[in-house]
């Protein structure tokens, strides 16, 4: 009934087979069905934390509910790196969720690539740190990359090939910028999708 009322409200022309299907009563219970959650963004962050721990980093999960502009998230992770670098501790800051990109340009990229690239200016000139962000499904935007990686050398390397980070972000062209400095992360399709994970590593 609800689906039919929505179709009527928006004057949707449904096929006769669709109308017939929607007129059937929705089953109230399915006794032979079991639902089990086998993965989530929270588990993704926990797995990332375990991996970082195995590499000697103290993992800190900042959130598994990240939901903001990709550029803002990248800048924020970059600022966290600047705050904690040089303290003699190996720390991994982990953020899971899904950011958004409001398109202002005509470039190529995805939210994870844009997040990573936006962190590059904050990391510029620093040693022993990086930020990377990936989609758990292995794809990021309309590209073959899962995400991107930047470190303290990235912005310098971009300048060396004539690429300005801020102009690139304004054109939403993170893919080509990261490609130029070997900063794309390409995994291929993973067969799952539990949002994205971004990590800032500091020593």
Predicted regions and their residues:
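Catalytic cores of large soluble enzymes that bind and process phosphate-bearing ligands
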Residues: 36-40, 44, 65, 69, ...
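C-terminal structural cap/anchor segments
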Residues: 89-90, 94-130
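Internal helix-turn-beta structural module
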Residues: 117-203
């Amino acid at each position: 009934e609800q689906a039919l009322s929505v179709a009527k409200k928006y004057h949707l022309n449904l096929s006769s087979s669709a109308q017939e299907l929607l007129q059937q009563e929705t089953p109230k219970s399915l006794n032979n069905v079991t639902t089990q959650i086998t993965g989530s963004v929270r588990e993704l962050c926990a797995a990332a934390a375990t991996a970082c721990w195995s590499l000697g980093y103290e993992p800190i999960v900042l959130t598994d509910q990240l939901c903001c502009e990709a550029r803002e998230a990248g800048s924020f992770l970059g600022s966290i790196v600047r705050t904690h670098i040089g303290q003699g501790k190996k720390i991994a800051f982990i953020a899971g969720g899904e950011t958004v990109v409001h398109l202002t340009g005509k470039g190529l990229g995805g939210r994870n690539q844009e997040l990573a690239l936006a962190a590059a200016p904050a990391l510029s000139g620093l040693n022993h740190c990086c930020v990377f962000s990936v989609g758990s499904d292995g794809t990021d935007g309309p590209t073959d990359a899962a995400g991107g990686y930047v470190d303290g050398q990235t912005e310098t390397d971009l300048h060396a090939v004539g690429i300005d980070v801020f102009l690139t972000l304004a054109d939403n062209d993170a893919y080509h910028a990261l490609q130029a400095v070997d900063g794309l992360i390409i995994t291929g399709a993973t067969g799952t999708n539990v949002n994205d994970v971004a990590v800032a590593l500091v020593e």
